From Swiss-Prot:
Protein name, as recorded: Protein O-GlcNAcase
Organism in which the protein naturally occurs: Mus musculus (Mouse)
Any Pfam family: NAGidase
Marked site positions, Cleavage: 413-414
Function: Cleaves GlcNAc but not GalNAc from O-glycosylated proteins. Deglycosylates a large and diverse number of proteins, such as CRYAB, ELK1, GSDMD, LMNB1 and TAB1. Can use p-nitrophenyl-beta-GlcNAc and 4-methylumbelliferone-GlcNAc as substrates but not p-nitrophenyl-beta-GalNAc or p-nitrophenyl-alpha-GlcNAc (in vitro). Does not bind acetyl-CoA and does not have histone acetyltransferase activity.
EC number assigned by the record: 3.2.1.169
Length: 916
């Protein structure tokens, strides 16, 4: 089957060459203006731009490059990508996943029969959707350019791919060593000459295809030595590379905040052709904490007539790229004819572009330099509005039907490439397994896993991050809302697809858990009809728990999500506002401390008002997390859950810290004021919030992997109040275990009085509780300096306990309860000063056994330690019974370590410590 289709593909390619002799001979418009090798053409950039805009020239390549470091997308995701590209009027897909081993590391290996059929299916699907499929290969890691066998191996590999039906190719020499081996140095005068030589040879061997891309090793401004205009490497590329070959370029930097027109004119001049932009603005493979959901930005539509194309290299997570690709399409369509800005005339009154310009002029204060034809904020609104529809529809890639417009898509062995495993008895979803092109026999895990990215391979710019200037929320005019609604409705009406039938069924209040595909695993019961569902629907009684109904994701949720995960160099307006508010609350917290001298009621009111507003913003994040976790489209959820989980966790800590700042009695201004500005890169918005907490270096507490199965449950950590005492005592009593159960029911408060009573009474400033929907389920208590705390206990707490519990007779054998009572009447041992100098703070923590989420304990410990360090603590310790294995393990998982025995330590306890 493979050989038959390959022969047909070769015949088809030969007929295309005969029908287009100009393409076969390599003659093109670019060749007619590009200088001959070795000639100098100072006006080359302008000539390329003119030819690029002329009628009949090669089309502008605009689409997606799968070129990130990380697990490649699977075949069904790529087919879904083709559908979206066609829908949004984009035209190109470049296959270049760095971690597909046959693309880069083991580029010499040929594809197996199974892999070949998958590639043929993919190329055929791209053709059906009218998407140009460009196959890229990266031999630069270890190829010997002067070895004819190596060149023949590369030709044989690309010849195999061409037999699959591929017509467009790319040779990539990015992210490799500049040094040549000894054999190459004898043949080639420079690294650039070696690369250009093999690229030209491969290009001619393949029949000079219409689209052939070359990625230089100096692929951005910062990689050029000494600079772009004087780079010998780029000059060689411009002079020696055949004019029919296009050059990829990422802009001034690897991840370019902006790509100025002047920078493109500069590089076009030296490479003697307009480049194709490989855009990393939405790439997130260099930071495992970051996701980019902001709009395509920082690239004027004035670039379009000066380029041969733009290919965005987006997030590693496929479903997280809806906004990135959608806004790129909006950018491209705003000037897809390549019209120069100085000749742009007013569009017709009913055009989308005209309406967008009107809206931006009337209701926005966006930067003055905003493109006349393209508004990033409007493009983001349009993308999020359309993306919202996807969250209510379960994704089942393998069941999607494509409209045939030409060659038929092959099916491997008649089985879908991605199975749909059942996560539980009622929900059936498709788990997306991210793998390179592999044989069908490859083992697949049966459960969804949280995807992690490779360690940093590309270093973005080390420069400060700008925040988006917060826009004042103004009431939009009614006619503006109507116009926006009409735009979205018109777009949706024009772009109906097979999924829309599912949307209609969802609109009829059909539970998403009942949606099931025909190709699901056989032991799952078939889907019931609406009539059967109505007959068998359970109706709870008046005293029974009502049916659970999940709130749908809202447009406001997606806007908040985009603001929290915006772009590499800036946070969205809401994210920037939250960061500024937390920084202000932190720096001005001294005004609300109880012992603050010269209190200013106006400043106190301002602080509490802004704190309340900040807590409301944190609540919006929690609500967004809950609704997203319950959405019907589990495919989107799985791709983004780890990021949303991370921001939810850090915002929970930050909210608790702000609440603590507002109710403590001691001022910590000396520690909190005077930090540097919070502009940084690593970790995105969550990382910046972490750096503003006192224990920013406690990375183990901030590392909170999400659960294997997504959950929408949210816990609240807040400061302890006296009314919580009974609940904390109850947890303390229930979790205490001496091996035989609780033996003294007649004294229910005894354990609480012994373990937590003193801290709750005398150290309120450093006490937190954990809550869920049923009430308090955990506590974290501490005192910043145990020495004065013990003195206070001797004055007030111990006498009260001695009065409450009579000293038992020590002549007889004492029960466990009597031993505890006796401890109140005995002299307390004092820990050595040498130990307390490094670990001055005492902590006690416990969580009810019903709480199974391990991240909750880390968050509680982070809140407690933040409050202690904010008041100058260098370290904390806890005392644990040697036989209490559960609590020993509990503290160990929270970063506490056993302190070596020293003189003065109690003999009946183990002391664990943690440095701050």
């Amino acid at each position: 089957m493979v050989q038959k289709e390959s022969q047909a593909a070769l015949e088809e390619r030969e007929s295309e060459r005969n029908a287009n002799p100009a393409a076969a001979s390599g003659a093109s418009l670019e060749q007619s203006v590009a200088p001959a090798p070795g000639e100098d053409n100072p006006s080359g950039a302008g000539a390329a731009a003119v030819v690029g805009a002329a009628g009949g020239a090669r089309r502008f390549l605009c689409g997606v490059v799968e070129g990130f470091y990380g697990r490649p997308w699977v075949m069904e995701q790529r087919k879904e990508l083709f559908r979206r590209l066609q829908k949004w009027e984009l035209n190109t897909y470049l296959y270049a996943p760095k971690d597909d081993y046959k693309h880069r590391m083991f580029w010499r290996e040929m594809y197996s029969v199974e892999e070949a059929e998958q590639l043929m299916t993919l190329i055929s699907a791209a053709r059906e959707y009218e998407i140009e499929f460009i196959y890229a290969i990266s031999p630069g890691l270890d190829i010997t350019f002067s070895n004819p066998k190596e060149v023949s191996t590369l030709k044989r590999k690309l010849d195999q791919v061409s037999q699959f039906g591929c017509r467009s190719f790319a040779l990539l020499f990015d992210d490799i060593d500049h040094n040549m081996c000894a054999a190459d140095k004898e043949v080639f005068s420079s690294f650039a000459h070696a690369q250009v030589s093999i690229t030209n040879e491969i290009y001619q061997y393949l029949g000079e295809p219409e689209t052939f891309l070359f990625c230089p090793t100096e692929y951005c401004g910062t990689f050029c030595y000494p600079n772009v205009s004087q780079s010998p490497y780029l000059r060689t590329v411009g002079e020696k590379l055949l004019p029919g070959i296009e050059v990829l370029w990422t802009g001034p930097k690897v991840v370019s905040k902006e790509i100025p027109v002047e920078s493109i004119e500069e590089v076009s001049k030296i490479i003697k052709r307009a480049p194709v932009i490989w855009d990393n603005i939405h790439a997130n493979d260099y930071d495992q904490k970051r996701l980019f959901l902001g709009p395509y930005k920082g690239r004027s539509t004035e670039l379009i007539p000066r380029l041969k194309g733009v290919l965005t290299n987006p997030n590693c997570e496929f479903e997280a790229n809806y906004v990135a690709i959608h806004t790129l399409a909006t950018w491209y369509k705003s000037n897809m004819n390549g019209v120069r800005k100085d000749v742009v005339m007013t569009d017709s009154e009913d055009s989308t572009v005209s309406i967008q310009i009107k809206l931006e002029n009337e209701g926005s204060d966006e930067d003055i330099e905003t493109d006349v034809l393209y508004s990033p904020q409007m493009a983001l609104k349009l993308a999020l509005t359309e993306w919202l529809q996807e969250f209510g529809v379960p994704h089942q890639y393998s069941s999607r039907q494509v409209a045939h417009s030409g060659a038929k898509t092959s099916v491997v062995d008649g089985t879908p490439l991605v199975a749909a495993p059942s996560l539980n008895a009622t929900t059936v979803v498709t788990t997306v397994y991210q793998e390179p092109i592999m044989s069908q026999g490859a083992a697949l895990s049966g459960e969804p896993s949280v995807l992690t990215k490779e360690e940093e391979k590309k270093q973005p710019d080390e420069e400060p991050m700008d925040m988006v200037v917060e826009k004042q929320e103004e009431a939009e005019h009614k006619n503006d809302n109507q116009i926006l609604t009409e735009i979205v409705e018109a777009k949706m009406a024009e772009e109906l697809r097979p999924m829309d039938t599912d949307k209609e069924s969802m609109a009829e209040s059909k539970s998403p858990e009942m949606s099931m595909q025909e190709d699901c695993i056989p032991d799952v019961a078939p889907m019931q009809t609406d009539e059967q569902t109505q007959k068998e629907q359970f109706v709870p009684g008046p005293n029974e728990k009502p049916l659970y109904t999940a709130e749908p994701v809202t447009l406001e949720d997606l806007q908040l999500l985009a603001d929290l995960f915006y772009l590499p160099y800036e946070h969205g307006p809401k994210g920037a506002q939250m960061l500024r508010e937390f920084q202000w609350l932190r720096a001005n917290s001294s005004v609300v401390s109880v012992n603050c001298k010269g209190k200013d009621s106006e400043k106190i009111e301002e602080w509490r008002s802004r704190a309340a507003k900040f807590e409301e913003m944190c609540a919006l994040v929690m609500g967004m997390f809950t609704r997203l976790s319950n959405c019907a489209n589990r495919t989107i959820l799985y791709d983004m859950y780890s990021y949303v989980w991370d921001i939810k966790s850090i915002m929970s800590m930050v909210k608790s810290f702000v609440q603590w700042l507002g109710c403590r009695s001691h001022s910590s201004a000396q520690f909190l004021i005077g930090d540097q500005e919070p502009w940084a890169f690593r970790g995105g918005l969550a990382g910046e919030f972490q750096r503003l907490l006192p224990i920013d270096g406690a990375n183990d507490l901030f590392f909170q992997p999400p659960p294997l199965t997504p959950t929408s449950k949210v816990y609240t950590i807040r400061p302890y109040f006296p009314k919580d005492e009974a609940s904390v005592y109850k947890i303390c009593r229930e979790m205490y275990d001496d091996g035989v159960g609780f033996p003294f029911q007649s004294q229910p408060d005894l354990i609480g009085d012994k373990l937590v009573g003193g801290l709750l009474s005398l150290s309120l400033d450093y006490c937190f509780v954990l809550e869920d929907e049923d009430g308090i389920c955990g506590y974290a208590l501490g005192t910043v300096d145990v020495t004065p705390f013990i003195k206070k206990c001797k004055i007030s707490w111990i006498p009260f306990m001695q009065e409450k519990y009579t000293k038992p007779n020590g002549d007889k054998e004492l029960s466990e309860a009597e031993k505890i009572m006796l401890s109140f009447h005995e002299e307390q041992e004092v820990l050595p000063e040498t130990f307390l100098a490094n670990f001055p703070s005492l902590i006690k923590m416990d969580i009810h056994k019903k709480v199974t989420d391990p991240s909750v304990a880390k968050s509680m410990m982070a809140c407690l330690l933040s409050s202690l360090k904010a008041n100058g603590s260098r370290g904390a310790f806890c005392e644990v019974r040697p036989d209490d294995k559960r609590i020993l393990e509990f503290y160990s998982k929270l970063g506490c370590f056993e302190i070596a025995k020293m003189e003065g330590f109690p003999k009946d306890v183990v002391i664990l410590g943690r440095s701050l």
